[in-house]
């Protein structure tokens, strides 16, 4: 079965005034759909199916036919990255995390303010197109990072739990070249409950439920 564009759990205008409806619609139905189409075409051209989750596919790119490595990296990464992005934003988002995620951000990253400063710098410091990330390393540690283009932390063995798209298509209609304003707007829609859920899943997969 080919990969499909995931439906959003909210309307395109639900994140306004922080992220406008037109940007959301174009970003979802055109940009993300293009990545889905490109990934399906690459796999079909190589005679491969798409039965596994795209996240699993990205972890094993070296095992795929060399001729499709670039397409899977770009289109598969774009599909996985955007699929995460839609879920970690919410009309009722914003604020700060609580519970275990908040405690571990405090212990490992110096607290929420320090995390947000590092995440902002990752987003601002990414030259050109790319992403800012909060990930879980194979050692079960939180890490702030960035990646170029549509590269996913999954390709390096890390598990993303929060991601921000800093390609211009993600913000230019509303914010033009004002990337700092876009980053600040993103914090107002982050769904920390979803990020925390992803954190618990990542730790569980590493066998660190009680760590």
UniProtKB/Swiss-Prot annotation:
Annotated PANTHER family: 37S RIBOSOMAL PROTEIN S26, MITOCHONDRIAL, SMALL RIBOSOMAL SUBUNIT PROTEIN MS42
Gene name for this UniProt entry: sodA
Protein's name according to its UniProt entry: Superoxide dismutase [Mn]
UniProt similarity note: Belongs to the iron/manganese superoxide dismutase family.
EC number per UniProt: 1.15.1.1
Organism this protein belongs to: Bordetella pertussis (strain Tohama I / ATCC BAA-589 / NCTC 13251)
Keywords linked to the UniProt accession: Manganese, Metal-binding, Oxidoreductase
Any one GO molecular-function label of the UniProt entry: metal ion binding
Superkingdom field: Bacteria
Cofactor note: Binds 1 Mn(2+) ion per subunit.
Function: Destroys superoxide anion radicals which are normally produced within the cells and which are toxic to biological systems.
Subunit text: Homodimer.
Entry GO CC: cytoplasm
Cofactors, names only: Mn(2+)
Reaction catalysis annotation: 2 superoxide + 2 H(+) = H2O2 + O2
Pfam families xrefs: Sod_Fe_C, Sod_Fe_N
Enzyme class: oxidoreductase
Binding-site residues for Mn(2+), renumbered to this chain: 27, 82, 165, 169
